[in-house]
Each structure stands twice: as C-alpha cells, then as structure tokens.
C-alpha cells in the first residue's frame, strides 16, 4: 500500500498519476496506490511527517525547507524538469521588465514557494521591504483575486493553472505581461516525489 499526497487540488498537473491508477499500471506492479488530494490547508511535509502519507509531491524549495527543519525527506523521482511558475502583471502598470517592479505590489506564494522569487529580486538588486525603490510583497493566497481586484500589480501564477484562471475571468492576454521564472534564471524544480529516509 502506498499513499501519495498531492501538493494541490486535483488538476491537470497530476493527470499522469490518475491515468496510471485508472489504467492499472500501479496494480501491474503490485502497488495499491491511494492518491490524496492536496489543497490550501494541506501541507504535504506535515502529512508525510505525521504518517498520513508514504510519499508526497512537493516543490524542491519547500522540501529543502522541510529538511532544514529536521524532516528527513529525500527526492526519489523528478517528473517535472522545468518550472511553470511565472509572474503575471497588468500591462497598464507600465511594467515591461523586472526593473519596473520597483514601487509595485507583487503577490507571492509562501510556504517555501517564496524562495525563487526572493532569489530573483536579490539578483535584480530590488528590495522586498517596500518603498519606491523596492517592492511591496503581498502574501498571496492560492488564487488570482489580488490581480483581478487590483490589490497587486503582479501575482504568482502557474502556466497550466492560475494564468488560465485570469483569462477565464475575462482578462485579455493583451492586458497582461508575464515573466517566466525559467527565463529569469531563477526557476527551481517542481513536483518532485519525496519520501522519508
């Protein structure tokens, strides 16, 4: 028996795991797999540490943070080789490049997801403490509301999820500018499979 804790709600990101279950690939290998959906109130490292799962999917920065706090996690598989993380910004804010972030409010996911962003801003020499020469960091929930409600000039999005939610809300691609972390040289590995040592 193997209980796999997803890091987020059931969506296309995890399709391969569900297809393998449906097609019997796990049972062909004598594995009885239960897939546990994640969500905004579920921290996969805590579920793994508490014995609620045998394996978890997690981003590397979050897994490294958990390991630094004493949870002996190890990566046993890395299905995603590139990052889908990006910032999605309103074009009418005048943002054309990262240097234009100064004086703006940017929504950032936390719980280990903030590290690539902080690394990026450090490389750009932009303070994350606010002010006209820095940026104001908004602790973004796992939704697109701060952008749609104009609480933030930019928000964290995934190419395969939240960006589509912004478009589905009636926003045109012409109204947006995006910055993929891969293109900025600060992307980290996502969706690794981790177990305890």
Regions found by a protein language model. Give the residues of each.
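Flexible hinge/capping segments at coil-to-helix
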Residues: 90-105, 128-130, 197
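Short, well-ordered beta-strand elements
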Residues: 1-10, 31-37, 103-107, 135-136
